[in-house]
């Protein structure tokens, strides 16, 4: 097994596991990896959608792809995925993409603890479980790569997204910590932090009724990219040894504003919040 290097890029001819591969960014990751010569495990809680992704891969490439059911919030399910992946691929996994996620919005005091647990179950524990079961394998084989899909929500602190923000900021912190801890083991880490991308996460999320139609309007008018473009940029940055992928202009603007003056940034959000309330009434 060759060590990861500039001559052996993580996204090229990878043996990959992608969670949430049944749609959106996850499907785009699976398709792009197949185009780059990789064999892909398409894991999703919806097995039929994962199979659709596999069918797409098989219709356009000669690489291997497999659909596997996985509830990333259940440690037993992710453990089984880790064991099954190597058996199906016939080779140790070289790239893990923790992508599965759900959307949750609403005022802090209106979001139930049950919904908090649901969001944490998928968005945070799903990533923790993936890293927990694959990192030891990467260490043992002497190389590997991880992409964790977070969100610009992890640092923008947007109102009425508390639970979602908390999960994504945790994924960001986890990724940064793993990058420093795993560097000596030749394990690359990249964390993806996009703003709006046309996917089903908002449509299938748990959002207040007053948000009805808002998600579609935002995606139609303010999505500066596509899931395919985001994925290509992320894989290229992983190959280049970069930790962060912040793909859109607005995501980069928020990133630098927050770092330039954190207190002023949060104050401005608070001043602008009444306008958001007017829009969603």
Language-model segments: residues:
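Active-site helix of classical SDR
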Residues: 131, 167
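SDR active-site lid
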Residues: 184-249
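Conserved glycine-rich Rossmann-like NAD(P)H-binding loop of the short-chain dehydrogenase/reductase
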Residues: 38-52
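Conserved glycine-rich cofactor-binding loop
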Residues: 15, 22-23
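Substrate-binding pocket helix/loop in short-chain dehydrogenase/reductase
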Residues: 107-108, 112-117
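Residue(s) in the substrate-gating loop at a strand-loop-helix junction
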Residues: 151
């Amino acid at each position: 097994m060759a060590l990861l290097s500039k001559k052996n890029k993580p996204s090229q001819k990878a043996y990959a596991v992608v969670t949430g591969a049944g749609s959106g960014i996850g499907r785009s990751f699976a398709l792009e990896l197949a185009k780059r010569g990789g064999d892909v495990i398409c894991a999703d809680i919806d097995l039929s959608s994962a199979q659709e992704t596999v069918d797409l891969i098989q219709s356009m490439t000669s690489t291997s792809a497999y659909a596997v059911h996985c509830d990333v919030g259940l440690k037993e399910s992710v453990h089984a995925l880790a064991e099954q992946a190597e058996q199906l691929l016939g080779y140790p996994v070289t790239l893990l993409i923790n992508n599965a996620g759900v959307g949750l919005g609403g005022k802090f005091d209106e979001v139930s603890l049950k919904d908090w647990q649901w969001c944490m179950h998928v968005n945070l524990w799903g990533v923790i479980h993936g890293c927990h079961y694959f990192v030891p394998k990467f260490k043992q084989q002497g190389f590997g790569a991880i992409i964790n899909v977070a969100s610009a929500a992890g640092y923008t602190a947007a109102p009425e997204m508390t639970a979602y923000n908390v999960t994504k900021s945790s994924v960001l912190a986890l990724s940064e910590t793993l990058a420093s801890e795993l560097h000596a083991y030749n394990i690359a880490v990249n964390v993806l932090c996009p703003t709006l991308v046309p996917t089903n996460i908002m449509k299938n999320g748990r959002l207040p009724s007053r948000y009805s139609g808002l998600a579609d309007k935002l995606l139609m008018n303010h999505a500066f990219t596509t899931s395919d473009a985001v994925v290509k940029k992320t894989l290229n940055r992983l190959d280049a040894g970069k930790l962060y992928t912040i793909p859109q202009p607005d995501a980069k603007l928020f990133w630098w504003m927050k770092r330039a003056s954190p207190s002023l940034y949060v104050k401005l959000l608070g001043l602008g919040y009444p306008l958001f309330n007017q829009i969603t009434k």
